[in-house]
């Protein structure tokens, strides 16, 4: 389809060139100009004053016709009539070979005559060549003006009707943004599935990406979260498999990599809907699933695979029946997140194992130096870059109302409890910095009759999957999570994003708040809780084009449950143990923050931080102890939930051991 406009343009230009050449010939005949024949299309020039006229090998009255039949195209501009200089050897297009053969058959007869003519014209030719070198653009413009004065100009109406406008670039040529406009490019079964999914118009990233990808271009795309990147790469991927008529025996043709299991499941869900009317095989490969069952499916042949990098590399190295040598397309979704979570080495190994002749797509919400490095090793030399939001003032979507609240350390949990209780009928996501912190607050809030769900990296996969779909299908509720849920997940109608613990950097903030206000005309709210010492983080957010305003909270209306919280943590052994783990992990996560000039663990008031976890006296945390040693000692003490009195626990450097008795003078006062 992309060649049709060029063919049409070529035919119309040839037609116009024919008319222009015929007019030029009439003018040349009136001026008594003589044209000399040259072998195989060579052009000689004679000087008439300061004017140059192009000469062809054919007779004067047939010059325009013969050159047009041989496919010759001049460089005349559309708006002006120019007589341009021809190179010493004319370029021959589609029908040139036939013309050369016919001229060669007559070359012997004309050989003597031609030599004589060339010898006679030799002085003039040398003179013409010398003048050729000295001619400037201004002289050629003067020649054009002189020619125009003697040639009858065509009507403006004729110009407008005969000369089409040049097509625009790939990213801006198409005004129609409906999926129906892809009817000549996309299979009708795919369009039918898209219609059944409820989509009629393409988003900006889809509009700019799908057509180039259907042409086989490599692509590096950057767009805000919730902009529709998933369909932007799934539609071309499915079309590639359909057009190549991939069968299970051909193995894997498309590979889609996702940073987290939840995002992989979500992408697989969209792919499943898109493949409703197709017969090709597709599958999900991720950690936490049954590996032997995955290996069996790979042996049978999966045409489109959605996978996480770790499990995929495992199968590529250890599953003999996995055929990926026929791979046609590699898609890396949330490329920056894949690199952030430590899959950089796995990704490089995967790229080395895959065939080099393939189409590659990199999609991400943010562009980092690591993503650029990945693009260099995975994309071809000239990939197409699509940046939807490069020229926009804000890095977050317009429908998002976001702000921050300054809260002292000792009142953080009281603020969170009051906020969740007030918004029980809404859908909220609360982000924490560590798995143990999520686990503790999940147990605590459910214990005090405030039902919440939780997702974190230390859960078993079945639990994570069940919780994820339970929250997706809920009309209201609260999900406590780590950054494992911050990327790519399309959870419907989330009203509030609460960042209880600040993110590691502004890019992570953008991804967290991207879970709300998704899609066209999406609306949502985001709340960032900061300690007074952490207000410097706002400067980094402003540099990243994140507009934040301060929210006003009536502190008199904050629920004062501090005394009840302390009594509960004191009396309930299991909650006490969980609170210790959470406090320890919070301090460690704070110490590992990348922006140490703002999030400095030495500036923390530990007694006040301990109050937010329900402790009157802060548990002991040794930041110099290796985290692996801490985990081993914790397991040696009975796993954190059981009670086993051992010497290792009594000598633990991580936290002080307490007994089941409520009267413990080391931790609590009567």
From Swiss-Prot:
Biased composition regions of type Basic and acidic residues, renumbered to the chain: 117-154
EC number: 3.6.4.13
Membrane-spanning ranges: none
GO biological-process terms attached to the record: cellular response to estradiol stimulus; maturation of LSU-rRNA from tricistronic rRNA transcript (SSU-rRNA, 5.8S rRNA, LSU-rRNA)
First-level EC class: hydrolase
Boundaries of every Helicase C-terminal domain copy: 399-569
Keyword match Oxidoreductase: no
Catalytic activity of the protein: ATP + H2O = ADP + phosphate + H(+)
Annotated ATP binding sites: 223-230
Residue numbers covered by motif DEAD box: 333-336
Region (Disordered): 31-169
Subcellular location: Nucleus, Nucleolus; Chromosome
Gene Ontology molecular function: ATP binding; ATP hydrolysis activity; RNA binding; RNA helicase activity
Motif (Q motif): 179-207
An example Gene Ontology CC term for this record: nucleolus
Ranges of biased composition (kind: Polar residues): 31-42, 83-105
Main localization of the protein described in the UniProt heading: nucleus
Mutagenesis or variant effect for residue 41 to R: In a breast cancer sample; somatic mutation
Domain Helicase ATP-binding: 210-385
Annotated keywords: ATP-binding, Chromosome, Helicase, Hydrolase, Nucleotide-binding, Nucleus, RNA-binding
Family: Belongs to the DEAD box helicase family. DDX18/HAS1 subfamily.
Its job: ATP-dependent RNA helicase that plays a role in the regulation of R-loop homeostasis in both endogenous R-loop-prone regions and at sites of DNA damage. At endogenous loci such as actively transcribed genes, may act as a helicase to resolve the formation of R-loop during transcription and prevent the interference of R-loop with DNA-replication machinery. Also participates in the removal of DNA-lesion-associated R-loop. Plays an essential role for establishing pluripotency during embryogenesis and for pluripotency maintenance in embryonic stem cells.
PANTHER family: RNA HELICASE (PTHR24031)
Subunit structure and binding partners: Interacts with NOL8; the interaction is RNA-dependent. Interacts with PRC2 complex components EZH2, SUZ2 and JARID2; these interactions prevent deposition of the repressive H3K27me3 mark onto rDNA in pluripotent cells.
Descriptive protein name: ATP-dependent RNA helicase DDX18
Organism of this sequence: Homo sapiens (Human)
């Amino acid at each position: 389809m992309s060649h049709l406009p060029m063919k049409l343009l070529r035919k119309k230009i040839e037609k116009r060139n024919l008319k222009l050449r015929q007019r030029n010939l009439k003018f040349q005949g009136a001026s008594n100009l003589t044209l000399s024949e040259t072998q195989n299309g060579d052009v000689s020039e004679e000087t008439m004053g300061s004017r140059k006229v192009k000469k062809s090998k054919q007779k004067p009255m047939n010059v325009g016709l013969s050159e047009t039949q041989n496919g010759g195209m001049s460089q005349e501009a559309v708006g002006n009539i120019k007589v341009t200089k021809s190179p010493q050897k004319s370029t021959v297009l589609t029908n040139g070979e036939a013309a050369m053969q016919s001229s060669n058959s007559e070359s012997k007869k004309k050989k003597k005559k031609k030599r004589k003519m060339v010898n006679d014209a030799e002085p003039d030719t040398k003179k013409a060549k010398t003048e050729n070198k000295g001619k400037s653009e201004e002289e050629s413009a003067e020649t054009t003006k002189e020619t125009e004065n003697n040639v009858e100009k065509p009507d403006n109406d004729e110009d407008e009707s005969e000369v089409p406008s040049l097509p625009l670039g790939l990213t801006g040529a198409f005004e129609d943004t409906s999926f129906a406009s892809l009817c000549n490019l996309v299979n009708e079964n795919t369009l039918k599935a898209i219609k059944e999914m409820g989509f009629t118009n393409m988003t900006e990233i889809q509009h700019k990406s799908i057509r180039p990808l259907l042409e086989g271009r490599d692509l590096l795309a950057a767009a805000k979260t919730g902009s529709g990147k998933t369909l932007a790469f799934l539609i071309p991927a499915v079309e590639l498999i359909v057009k190549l008529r991939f069968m299970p025996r051909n193995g894997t043709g498309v590979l889609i990599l996702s940073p987290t299991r939840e995002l992989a499941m979500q992408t697989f869900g969209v792919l499943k809907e898109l493949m409703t009317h197709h017969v090709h095989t597709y599958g999900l490969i991720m950690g936490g699933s049954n590996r032997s069952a995955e290996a069996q499916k790979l042996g049978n042949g999966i045409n489109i695979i959605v996978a996480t990098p770790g499990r995929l590399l495992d199968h590529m190295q250890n599953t003999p029946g996995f055929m990926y040598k026929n791979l046609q397309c590699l898609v890396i979704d949330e490329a920056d997140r894949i690199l952030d979570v430590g899959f950089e080495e796995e990704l490089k190994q995967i790229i080395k194992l895959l065939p080099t002749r393939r189409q590659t797509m990199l999609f991400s919400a943010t562009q980092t130096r690591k993503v650029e490095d990945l693009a260099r090793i995975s994309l071809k030399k000239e990939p197409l870059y699509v940046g939807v939001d490069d020229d926009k003032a804000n890095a977050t979507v317009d429908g998002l109302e976001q702000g921050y609240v300054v809260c002292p350390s000792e009142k953080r949990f009281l603020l969170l409890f009051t906020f969740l209780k007030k918004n029980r009928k809404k859908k909220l996501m609360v982000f924490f910095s560590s798995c143990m912190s999520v686990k503790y607050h999940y147990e605590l809030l459910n214990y005090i009759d405030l039902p919440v769900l939780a997702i974190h990296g230390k859960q078993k996969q079945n639990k994570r999957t069940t919780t994820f779909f339970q929250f997706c299908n809920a009309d209201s509720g609260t999900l406590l999570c780590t950054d494992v849920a911050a990327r790519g997940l399309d959870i419907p109608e989330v009203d509030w994003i609460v960042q209880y613990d600040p993110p590691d950097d502004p890019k992570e903030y953008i991804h967290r708040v991207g879970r709300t206000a998704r899609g066209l005309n999406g609306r949502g709210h985001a709340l960032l809780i900061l300690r007074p010492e952490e207000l410097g983080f706002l400067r980094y957010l402003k540099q990243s084009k994140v507009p934040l305003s301060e929210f006003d909270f009536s502190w008199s209306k904050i629920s004062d449950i501090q005394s009840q919280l302390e009594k509960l943590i004191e009396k309930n052994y299991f909650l006490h143990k969980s609170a210790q783990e959470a406090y320890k992990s919070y301090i460690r996560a704070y110490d590992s923050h990348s922006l140490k000039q703002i999030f400095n663990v030495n500036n923390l008031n530990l007694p006040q931080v301990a109050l937010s976890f329900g402790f009157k006296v802060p548990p002991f945390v040794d930041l110099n102890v290796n985290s692996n040693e801490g985990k081993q000692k914790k397991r040696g003490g009975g796993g954190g939930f059981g009670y086993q009195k051992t010497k290792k626990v009594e000598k633990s450097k991580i936290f002080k051991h307490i007994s089941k008795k409520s009267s413990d003078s080391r931790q609590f006062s009567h």
